[in-house]
């Protein structure tokens, strides 16, 4: 491979990537409006020159329909076949009752209450929302006593039949410190049934809890990969990694750059054996504002990181996470396609 190609700047990929994205749209055109979940339509385990490229389904959070079926269709529409699946999607498919409380309003009123800025009508509204949440908590507690794992097996089959593999599972609250061992085991078993090699969550501050999770992961034959935001630094995961071989890393390269870490590629070189998946987004460094940007326009070395993974044959997945604001003349799906094309171009250059 010529040095000229290897040393292309990140921004030089943008024009080529847009063209590739257009190609993906044309190639994937049959998916739009077509019957969903056509078996073997796409190849599972989407890899480019040895690098597994996926998307976290959090990227679809602003889409109106959040059902497992809709999330699958969005994935297919993007032309991707490997995902990190959000827990709420899987649990809803498995029969978890829906929380119909207006959570946005609840959080907004709760913030105002802490500042003593509620009107009398708002005080009544917040009290009603709290009562709704209490009733829902009781409903969930009752459901949890008799819940089954069958839905996760069915969900995996539906996704696999469409050519989509779930390599990571983010079970939200289920892995938190306050949860029972039964809930944690449930989350880990769900991950296994979905086909995931690891479950993900934010790295807890409590080392006793990371020890607990690591030991439970050993018993359930799965790994726990810890995610981070701007708390990330080169030694941030060290305690958890030392506690169990089943504790691992779900590093976020964009947040790592936004945190001001000066050598983002070095941590990949030093700890690749502990990384099971890496979130890929393009954030600016602190000096430039830390904003989420379209791929190629921020300060995150996406091209260099992907090519490092390819050249050194690192085995962890690169998970695209869509977080920047959708342009008025575009859609979430189209922007994710552009991000995929940008990564594809990097890996093929």
Give residue ranges: language-model regions:
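Histidine-acidic metal/acid-base catalytic patches
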Residues: 2-24, 29-81, 90-110, 114, ...
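A structural motif corresponding to the C-terminal end of an alpha-helix
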Residues: 154-165, 194, 308-315, 346-349
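A generic structural signal for short
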Residues: 59-60, 143-144, 175-176, 201-202, ...
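Active-site anion-binding loops
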Residues: 88-96, 100, 115-116, 146-166
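Intrinsically disordered, low-complexity acidic Ser/Thr-rich regulatory segments
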Residues: 120-160
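Active-site acidic/histidine proton-transfer and metal-coordination neighborhood
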Residues: 17-30, 45, 145, 151-152, ...
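Short beta-to-alpha linker loops that shape the active-site pocket of alpha/beta-hydrolase fold enzymes
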Residues: 86-89, 172
């Amino acid at each position: 491979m010529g040095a000229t190609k290897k040393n292309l700047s990140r921004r030089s990929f943008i024009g080529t990537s847009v063209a590739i994205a257009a190609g993906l749209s044309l190639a994937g055109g049959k998916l739009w409006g077509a019957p969903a979940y056509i078996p073997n339509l796409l190849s599972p385990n989407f890899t480019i020159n040895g690098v597994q490229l996926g998307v976290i389904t959090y990227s679809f959070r602003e889409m109106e329909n959040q059902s497992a079926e809709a999330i699958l269709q969005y994935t297919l529409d993007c032309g991707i076949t490997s995902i990190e699946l959000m827990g709420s999607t899987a649990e809803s498919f498995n029969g978890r009752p829906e929380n119909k409380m207006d959570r946005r309003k609840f959080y907004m009123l709760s913030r105002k209450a802490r500042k003593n800025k509620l009107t009398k009508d708002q005080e009544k509204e917040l009290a009603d929302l709290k009562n709704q949440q209490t009733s829902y908590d009781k409903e969930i507690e009752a459901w949890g006593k008799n819940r089954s794992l069958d839905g996760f097996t069915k969900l995996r089959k539906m996704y696999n039949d469409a050519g989509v593999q779930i390599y990571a599972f983010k079970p939200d609250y289920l892995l938190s410190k306050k949860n029972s061992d039964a809930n944690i085991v449930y989350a880990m078993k769900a991950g296994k049934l979905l086909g995931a090699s690891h479950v993900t969550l934010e790295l807890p501050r409590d080392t006793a809890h990371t020890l607990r999770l690591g030991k439970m992961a050993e018993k359930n034959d799965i790994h726990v990969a810890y995610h981070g935001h701007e708390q990330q630094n080169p030694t941030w995961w060290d305690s958890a990694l030392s506690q169990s071989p089943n504790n691992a890393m779900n590093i976020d390269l964009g947040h790592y750059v936004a945190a001001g870490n000066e050598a983002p590629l070095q941590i990949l070189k030093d700890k690749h054996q502990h990384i099971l998946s890496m979130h890929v987004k393009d954030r600016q460094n602190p000096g430039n504002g830390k904003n989420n940007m379209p791929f190629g326009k921020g300060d995150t070395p996406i091209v260099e990181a992907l090519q490092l993974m390819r050249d050194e044959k690192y085995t962890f997945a690169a998970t695209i996470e869509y977080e920047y604001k959708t342009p008025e003349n575009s859609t979430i799906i189209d922007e994710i396609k552009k991000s995929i094309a940008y990564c594809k171009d990097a890996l093929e250059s």
